[in-house]
Amino acid sequence: VLSAQVNPSGRLPMTFPLDYRDHLSSENYPFDYTSKRSDWEYDAPERKIRNLGWTEYLEGVDVGYRYFCTKATEKISFPFGFGLSYTSFEWSDAALTRKGNDFRVTLRVTNTGDRPGREVVQLYASAPESELCKPVRELKAFAKTPVLSPGSSATLELTFSAYDLASFDESLSAFVSQEGTYTLQLNRDASTIVTTLPLTLKK
């Protein structure tokens, strides 16, 4: 990889912030707590223990990249889904089709560089405004090309359903696919939008 004999095509499964403390969950990890006495420690004094084995997530829907994309865009060093390549790609002919509650997005990817390589397309959805708490975008699908030689192309297909757009409504105790116009974002990573498509859901 370092000598460019192999072209990397992996993507980050997490967000790298500028500072560890930029993670919302850092407020809960690690922390000191007072241990509980057990039967065999009846006379043992209570003691402070440094918690390193688990953490408590209190972010709600803003776990991981959702928090950084929604509320901390300026704190990102490398975004979720980021990756490098020794070549370049052009995306074109994005289209959306629907069959019942199932959706399909197709996209043509062309290697415009001078080395063989693979490209990854990530499909995010941005929901219409509502009373439900939602992040600014959520990953719904992704696809990867085969190895493309310079100048060659491939058509990728990304599929998802209306249920994948649903959010939990506590007042109904159910997942609900909200009506309205969603923005489908075809991204290189969670922060880099290449093109968008509208999707309208009706009851």
Map each language-model feature to its residues.
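Intrinsic-disorder/low-complexity, polar/charged segments enriched in Ser/Thr/Lys/Arg/Asp/Glu/Gln
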Residues: 102-104, 153-157, 194-196
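Intrinsically disordered, low-complexity Pro/Gly/Ser/Thr-rich segments with frequent PxxP/GP/PP motifs
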Residues: 131-172
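Short, solvent-exposed amphipathic alpha-helical segments in soluble enzyme
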Residues: 124-126, 174
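Secreted, periplasmic, or luminal enzymes acting at the cell surface/secretory milieu
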Residues: 1-118, 124, 179-187, 203
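Low-complexity, flexible helical/coil segments
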Residues: 20-26, 142-145, 158-160, 191-198
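Short, hydrophobic/aromatic beta-strand segments
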Residues: 116-123, 135, 168-170, 195
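Terminal connector regions
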Residues: 161-203
